[in-house]
């Protein structure tokens, strides 16, 4: 019997979402009954690639109110619906440290629509910022945010982290251990397929 196929699609702005995709792939390939794992940027995903999956993992950067690559994947809705076992993850500077889980879950639902993402597991991780790679638009927007945070009479830890990241050229808050619950969910799917 052929090993199940896991396709990991990622929409990465500054590389953090891709890093999580790579870590997920490494952990899955290290399983005793390892599935076949393929990674692809969302922009390169085809219907055929998506339909070849037994398990589909979709990861996206959450930046400026949008999930990177979501509009592209909405065009692949029919292909995604052929894969029963789908799960999602988001990567943002603060993750669930600042955003309530329900807020990020809602971003997934709004971005991919309920028929694709509804009742599917969603995981949320912290990423980072790379000022040297940031577009002028993002830098301008973050300058306003940084200024507002600096003017707050009581800055929380995450306000301070954003200010420091901006002033130090970036920050990386990724943590490989955060993927463990996602990998555990994939293990459940793999057991169902066995």
Identify the function of each model-found stretch:
Residues 64-194:
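FMN-binding flavodoxin-like domain, especially the glycine-rich phosphate-binding loop
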Residues 1-83, 180-194:
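N-terminal beta1-alpha1-beta2 submodule of the flavodoxin-like/Rossmannoid cofactor-binding fold
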